Amino acid sequence: MANVKLFDQTGKEVSTVELNDAIFGIEPNESVVFDVVISQRASLRQGTHAVKNRSAVSGGGRKPWRQKGTGRARQGSIRSPQWRGGGVVFGPTPRSYGYKLPQKVRRLALKSVYSAKVAEDKFVAVEALSFAAPKTAEFANVLSALSIDSKVLVIVEEGNKFAELSARNLANVTVATPATASVLDIVNADKLLVTKEAISSIEEVLA
């Protein structure tokens, strides 16, 4: 099993933590990670695009001229698609672009991205992130002490509200829990900052 250094909030190395190789030490499957990232990005699309078809365009209830005898082509409504100002045929309608992948695929993708971060030495383990109250400055000091100055995903245990609130106003900092950390979040982050308790939760969920 791989060992990573365990730091406290002041940036001091206090111990090491053992990581489960079945989760943090596998050969990353780039193809699966790609599929999951595409799926998650698709789910983020709003899909609120819409056009008006002939029934939605205002007006056009009266037949523009009689059926026969004018010499012109027969018409039933000035909102038919062939008219300027008419309805659109087969235009985009509101829809969801999201789709689900099998659970095994999603779990393998998570293991792959966690393993990649550990292999690239971009995984920082911290003993705990505990704050007496939500303080952005205190959280910024923790990141500074740990020499984290790039885009970081902080994974904390469930219920650590003060950590979430403290980091909310910091640029390039995203806070998640083991349950909400997505493959897309992990891929987008330059570094992972994970509490010891969160590591245990990740291993429990993905084991």
Swiss-Prot record:
GO MF annotation terms:
rRNA binding; structural constituent of ribosome
Question: Sorted alphabetically, which InterPro entries does this protein's record hold?
Answer: Ribosomal_uL4, Ribosomal_uL4-like, Ribosomal_uL4_dom_sf
Domain of life assignment = Bacteria
Region spans: Disordered = 49-78
Q: Give one Pfam family, short name only.
A: Ribosomal_L4
Asked if the record carries the keyword Cell membrane, the reply is no
Report the GO terms under cellular component.
ribonucleoprotein complex; ribosome
- Which terms under GO biological process does the entry name? translation
Q: What keywords does the record list, in alphabetical order?
A: Ribonucleoprotein, Ribosomal protein, RNA-binding, rRNA-binding
SUBUNIT field: Part of the 50S ribosomal subunit.
Please report which protein family the annotation says this sequence is part of.
Belongs to the universal ribosomal protein uL4 family.
Function, as annotated, reads: One of the primary rRNA binding proteins, this protein initially binds near the 5'-end of the 23S rRNA. It is important during the early stages of 50S assembly. It makes multiple contacts with different domains of the 23S rRNA in the assembled 50S subunit and ribosome. Forms part of the polypeptide exit tunnel.
- Protein name (database record): Large ribosomal subunit protein uL4
> What organism is the protein native to?
Streptococcus thermophilus (strain ATCC BAA-250 / LMG 18311)
Which classification does the entry list for the species?
Answer: Bacteria, Bacillati, Bacillota, Bacilli, Lactobacillales
Q: Which gene encodes it?
A: rplD
